[in-house]
């Protein structure tokens, strides 16, 4: 079995597969992905593979510079997005936006 390159919480799987979630915001430990990378995607909870994505763009962002567009690309409100990011990465402020499409 091939290892997954990136994982997402299971609660995001349906939005990714439906094309409603088209970015992910990560910390420095996952800042190495580049435009054009093709990644196997698994669920964080059980590492089960569920799709393959292609990275279409990357950029940096801070918690304070997150926008409504980021929230729309994450399929949530800006308030929800800031809370999710703060819950996943407490105390951090610098993040990496990975834009992607399902293949």
Curated annotation (Swiss-Prot):
Transmembrane segments: none annotated. Changing residue 24 to A: Loss of activity. It catalyses: N(4)-acetylcytidine + H2O = cytidine + acetate + H(+); N(4)-acetyl-2'-deoxycytidine + H2O = 2'-deoxycytidine + acetate + H(+); N(4)-acetylcytosine + H2O = cytosine + acetate + H(+). Pfam families: ASCH. Disruption phenotype: The mutant lacking the yqfB gene retains the ability to grow, albeit poorly, on N(4)-acetylcytosine as a source of uracil. Optimum temperature is below 20 degrees Celsius. Its EC number is 3.5.1.135. The active site is at 21 (proton acceptor), 24 (nucleophile), 74 (proton donor). Keywords: Hydrolase. This is N(4)-acetylcytidine amidohydrolase. The gene is yqfB.
